[in-house]
Amino acid sequence: MSMRTLFQTLSVLALSALPALAQETTAEPAEDLSMGTTAAAAPLTQETAQVGQGYLATNHDLWEQRCEKTEDGKDPCQLFQLLKDAEGNAVAEFSIFALPAGGPAAAGATVVAPLETLLTEALTIAIDTAPAKIYPFTFCTVEGCVARVGFTAEEVEQFKKGAKATVTLVPAAAPEKQVNLDISLKGFTAGYEAIAATVPAQ
């Protein structure tokens, strides 16, 4: 048999197998196919945000400087950091903002913890090796449970000079355990000074 004849024979066999292959392919539902997900839109910027929308102004290492667009251009800002556990899983959110001078708190913060957190144990925040302070949870939404925190001017200075802070939560499913989440303070000083400049003078 010549090479050409052999090639023609193999081609016929291959074509004759296609209907059977199609039947096998369509007979069983495909369970390993990805249907895709919608790609995340690019973060809003000061130029693309509309009045009332939040946008990402810049980054200070792991801190995001998030602001809200206003009509007069005096956009209030805060610092945001996503907190992860030892395995790198996103667990909680930490946001801090400067307050007008003269009050007991120089800065305010919100911590959003998972709904599975044991609320009666509250949460603690420690800056480096300083003693931890306890803060209660204020309310819960479908996105998580929120603690509203106030920091004194002295504590803000500790944030600026420190290496890390630690948020500690207690899981409701394992009340005997604690989950420690590090807050990197690298870039905090520059970021805090930037958001403090957006606070209206009293």
Sequence positions of predicted segments:
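Sec-dependent N-terminal signal peptides
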Residues: M1-E24
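A generic "folded-domain core" signal
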Residues: Q23-Q202
